[in-house]
Amino acid sequence: MAAIALCASSAAPGADQPPICADRPGKATGTCIVPTGHWQIETGLADWSEQDGGGERDTSLAIGETTIKYGLTDRSNIEVDVAPWQRATSHFAGAHESDSGFGDINVLFKQLLTSAAAPWQVAALPLVKIPTASHSLGNGKWEGGLLIPIGYSIPKTKLGIGLTPEIDWAADADGAGHHAAMAQVVSLGWAASEKLNLSAELWGAWDWDPAGTTRQASADGSVAYLLGNDVQLDAGANLGLNRVTPDVELYGGVSVRF
């Protein structure tokens, strides 16, 4: 979400390119495209979450989750998400179980659907999940989805709003087939200065597995800071709003364009 307000308001005069526009931080996805012929690396240095309930405490830690992007044209880029190391731990009845390893890989293609001058920016982002994670960290199934990022910079303000509806083709819990799932993010970003952006989000997800429907929700906040035109630092916190959502998630990362 940081991308909406920063890209709208902080381009330096005479800069060859506008400031880096990353999908980090937050759960919303921006409409911006990596410049043609450029690479962009968005890395989560650490991402930790915890969930308590039913006498069990579950924690997860991911180190180095990275999105690698390449600008194909001025309206499209390709992206690959990799999770080089994850650890999931469950604590219960004085004991615990833990597993760690490589996560799943996602391949995405982003296409901007509106002109650069349009007040509302809209993009399409189909994705495919490649099941590369170990069984305890993933479900071992191919999955897919489609995101439609929508962004709007409010005129004469330093505010931007964003929506990210998502529909997914998710594997059934029993591995017998697939079903529909969806998510939605509503975002508000504020460019506090030319380098600093603050954002708030509401996130919801619905998974209609034949074994039972799961609904999750969180209230999220994040901060992004431009170290330079091509480097951004970020941090954020997500707070679960129901029992099936992690109670708290904390993360920080860096994005670099070259």
List the predicted regions and their residue ranges.
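Transmembrane beta-barrel domains of Gram-negative outer membranes and organellar outer membranes
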Residues: 14-258
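Sec-dependent signal peptide recognition
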Residues: 1-3
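N-terminal signal peptide c-region/cleavage motif recognized by signal peptidases
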Residues: 8-10
